[in-house]
Amino acid sequence: SGSNLTTV
């Protein structure tokens, strides 16, 4: 499984 977290 893969998860992506992007905070700008």
From Swiss-Prot:
Keyword Magnesium: no
EC code(s) of this entry: 3.4.23.-
Keywords, comma-separated and alphabetical: Aspartyl protease, Glycoprotein, Hydrolase, Protease, Secreted
Glycosylation, residue list: 4
Tissue specificity note: Chorionic epithelium (trophectoderm) and placental cotyledons.
Chief localisation class: secreted
GO biological process, one term: proteolysis
Single GO MF descriptor: aspartic-type endopeptidase activity
Keyword Aminoacyl-tRNA synthetase: no
Subcellular location: Secreted, Extracellular space
GO cellular component, one term: extracellular region
Superkingdom of the organism of origin: Eukaryota
Class of the enzyme per the UniProt entry, highest EC level: hydrolase
More info: On the 2D-gel the determined pI of this protein is: 5.4, its MW is: 50 kDa.
Family, similarity comment: Belongs to the peptidase A1 family.
Name of the protein in question: Pregnancy-associated glycoprotein 50I
Origin species: Bison bonasus
Lineage: Eukaryota, Metazoa, Chordata, Craniata, Vertebrata
